[in-house]
């Protein structure tokens, strides 16, 4: 745990962790806690900055057999969130007592990188449309620059449709007509909020995988937070971590293994007999996992 490493070694992430990541260039990460209103920095932010993980990728896909508000729509939305700047740059200070200022950083380089990643994915996966989400009607310079970069990139992919939505309208459309979305590209803060909203459409954060990727490294993770109240009780839903492992396998070229793991998870949900409590079942972590393993072996 990062808290233990900080207490024992004075580092959130010990040097040997980074040495391993530098060697393998790939990692599978579990949830970690970030203190609210003080304490140590987010582990995710540290990793993203140190390893140049500028893409946060989250596929939001309906699982057969899982009851949700939109389980009849077979949603498949790919979300690309810029991972290194915006308000998450952490540049804030107290101007005078009672007045705090936070700086929103948007750069051409980072905006072009995330836009290119979204469009390259759309082309590679035969997707039809990329939607840029923004608040350029208010933040005309910062979000305006982000849109300029998205438009510039869209022009290089003429076979892919491109449109733009203001973030508040995009949130409304997601809960009313989620089926209209295909690939989304967003600055950091909006991406954090919208990707959690989208996860709720298909069953919540216990279901959805995530990846943080750069030019040389990639870390895959369950995007939900920690749950200290159920730690050690065998109640946690491992779906998001399994789905993230499948993303990792595909990333390193083990596409057949990735497909088998995803298919096994989907089969367990389709059967509905071994689901954890957060999705309406009565199984524990081990029972769910055993069911997935049986389907992989079968």
Outline where the language-model segments fall:
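N-terminal glycine-rich phosphate/adenylate-binding segment common to multiple enzyme folds
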Residues: 7-104, 189
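Flexible, glycine/charged-enriched surface loops at secondary-structure junctions
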Residues: 125-134, 157-165, 254-262, 271-282
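Glycine-rich phosphate/diphosphate-binding loop of Rossmann-like nucleotide-binding domains
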Residues: 96-168, 180-182
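Glycine-rich phosphate/nucleotide-binding loop
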Residues: 5-6, 15, 57, 173-276
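Phosphate-binding loop/pocket of nucleotide- and phosphate-handling active sites
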Residues: 284-298
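Short, glycine-/small-residue-rich phosphate/pyrophosphate-handling segment
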Residues: 63-91, 106-110, 225-259
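Short acidic loop-to-helix transition motifs that present clustered carboxylates
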Residues: 1-4, 165-172
